């Protein structure tokens, strides 16, 4: 079996039927012309935000990570492992793709520990066992994995989806693409940066050009590139016509170098 490709979905993608239609059409085209197994990892911050707003619950973030108190983890689990995950499975079904919905704890695929007590139920993802997902891939299924994990003590954890995708890529020896709302990392003039090193990223963070959630995304991509020993791409889902080429290894956004 070829090494898998993990496609991490993020941003407002899950909120846009047009975007999901484009994405799944691209996935169908890719699967028809390539034998390479695919895995989807997703968060769903927009789904969570809508739910929290409807319940009049405050959304707090610290260093770009969502603070998840004990009384909110059940709600966030329902939004990510429930609504967001099953929405993607429904789109896969619509496009005749045999998909299986998972969370990080299934088959111990990704190990999770608590990241920081101040963040509450927020987990740190580390590589786990490839057995379950490899078995699904060998049988032609598309695993769709939410970024909810569980600790060895049985505590549910909300994991940053970029970090979750990185840990799963390390588990499977997979390549990784981080799809987001933006076409890559932008410089101070709003121009896309084609390649990014750790030194360049540190410089842009110090200058305040890379901020908030993008810091988390860039650090996750740098961590992934180092862990995997190969480049990681950050790109946009907005250009559907480019997605099959992107999935095939053509750089379309910002390529993060190890």
Swiss-Prot record:
Keywords: Amino-acid biosynthesis, Arginine biosynthesis, ATP-binding, Cytoplasm, Kinase, Nucleotide-binding, Transferase. Gene3D superfamilies: Acetylglutamate kinase-like (3.40.1160.10). Substrate binds at residues 44-45, 66, 158. Changing residue 162 to E: Reduces activity over 99%. No effect on KM for N-acetyl-L-glutamate and ATP. Its EC number is 2.7.2.8. SUPFAM superfamilies: Carbamate kinase-like. InterPro entries: AceGlu_kinase-like_sf (IPR036393), AcgluKinase_fam (IPR004662), ArgB (IPR037528), Asp/Glu/Uridylate_kinase (IPR001048), NAGK-NC (IPR041731). ATP binds at residues 181-186, 209-211. One of its GO terms (cellular component) is cytoplasm. Pathway: Amino-acid biosynthesis; L-arginine biosynthesis; N(2)-acetyl-L-ornithine from L-glutamate: step 2/4. It is an enzyme of class 2 (transferase). GO terms for biological process: arginine biosynthetic process via ornithine; DNA damage response; L-arginine biosynthetic process. The record marks 8, 217 as: Transition state stabilizer. One of its GO terms (molecular function) is ATP binding. It is found in: Cytoplasm. It holds the Pfam family AA_kinase. It catalyses: N-acetyl-L-glutamate + ATP = N-acetyl-L-glutamyl 5-phosphate + ADP. Belongs to the acetylglutamate kinase family. ArgB subfamily. Homodimer. Catalyzes the ATP-dependent phosphorylation of N-acetyl-L-glutamate. PANTHER family: N-ACETYLGLUTAMATE SYNTHASE (PTHR23342), N-ACETYLGLUTAMATE SYNTHASE, MITOCHONDRIAL (PTHR23342:SF0). This is Acetylglutamate kinase. It comes from Escherichia coli (strain K12).
């Amino acid at each position: 079996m070829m090494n898998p490709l993990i496609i991490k979905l993020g941003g407002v993608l899950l909120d846009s039927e047009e975007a999901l239609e484009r994405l799944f059409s691209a996935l169908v085209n890719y699967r028809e012309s390539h034998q390479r197994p695919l895995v989807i990892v997703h968060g769903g911050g927009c789904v969570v935000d809508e739910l929290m707003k409807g319940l009049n619950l405050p959304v707090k973030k610290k260093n770009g990570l969502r603070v998840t108190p004990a009384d909110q983890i059940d709600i966030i689990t329902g939004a990510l492992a429930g609504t967001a995950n099953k929405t993607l499975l429904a789109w896969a079904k619509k496009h005749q793709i045999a998909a299986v919905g998972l969370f990080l704890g299934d088959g111990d695929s990704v190990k999770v520990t608590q990241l920081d007590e101040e963040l509450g139920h927020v987990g740190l993802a580390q590589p786990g066992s490839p057995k379950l997902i490899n078995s699904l891939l060998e049988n032609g299924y598309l695993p769709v994995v939410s970024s909810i994990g569980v600790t060895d003590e049985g505590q549910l954890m909300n994991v940053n989806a970029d970090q979750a995708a990185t840990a799963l890529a390390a588990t499977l020896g997979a390549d990784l693409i981080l799809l987001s709302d933006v076409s890559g990392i932008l410089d101070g003039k709003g121009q896309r940066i084609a390649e990014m090193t750790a030194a360049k990223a540190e410089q842009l963070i110090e200058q305040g050009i890379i901020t908030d959630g993008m810091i988390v995304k860039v650090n996750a991509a740098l961590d992934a590139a180092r862990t995997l020993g190969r480049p990681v791409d950050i790109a946009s889902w907005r250009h559907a016509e480019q997605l099959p080429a992107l999935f095939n290894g053509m750089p379309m956004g910002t390529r993060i170098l190890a």
